[in-house]
Amino acid sequence: MKLTSPIFNDQQKRRAIIWLSFFHIFIIAASNYFVQIPFEITLKLTALGAANDFSFHSTWGTLTFPFIFLATDLTVRIFGAEDARKIIFVVMFPALIVSYVISVLFSESKFQGFESLTHFDLFVFRIAIASFAAYVVGQLLDVIVFNRLRQLKTWWVAPTSSMTFGSMADTFVFFSIAFYQSADPFMAEHWAQLGFVDYLFKLFIGIILFVPAYGVVLNVILRKLQMLVTERVPA
């Protein structure tokens, strides 16, 4: 279904943009908390004859943040690229504040008390700036790529491509700003390798889970919109 008819009036579009903006901020807040909770994945390569198993660390934030790419792609599909960009520009400064506040309040995934906000944390602020820049660059690139490809007949090409390039930009911008020549010696030395592994894992999760989720949600939305259009057409 090609969405060319004015299905939504201006008030409905404004309401949708407001709710989508809150959804973006919620996901950013949740991701800034869950990114502090790590887990380890071990691939038993020795069972296949390899000399060693392969292990890597990630965080639960890797699983929550792609919801923003899902929401952005659906926004471009339903409302268009212009409204998707509006949401990004509305959200980006609240996202900066939320990123800093959540990271300070829940340092190492433990509540530090509201008094922690009375002390400015430069290290955390740098991470918040990195999160801010990564969100803006990654989402704008996601909109550009998806908008260029959304008219293709093969539905999965647009979300897969936009998530691939958007996540790449998001990951590189975040790790380079947050940890390049960081006060943390380990992160300063290994940020590129850690970012690359993080990107591969996010890409895997995105393609396996979020691209199919995009297809399912889009089909549901299109059926609802088709019913709405049919009801409006005079008999």
From Swiss-Prot:
InterPro entries with a match to the protein in the record: YhhQ (IPR003744)
Location, primary (coarse class): membrane
GO biological process entries: pyrimidine-containing compound transmembrane transport; queuosine salvage
Topology with respect to the bilayer: Multi-pass membrane protein
One Pfam family from the record: Vut_1
Claim: Transport is one of the keywords in the record: yes
Recorded family membership: Belongs to the vitamin uptake transporter (VUT/ECF) (TC 2.A.88) family. Q precursor transporter subfamily.
Protein name: Probable queuosine precursor transporter
Organism classification: Bacteria, Pseudomonadati, Pseudomonadota, Gammaproteobacteria, Pasteurellales
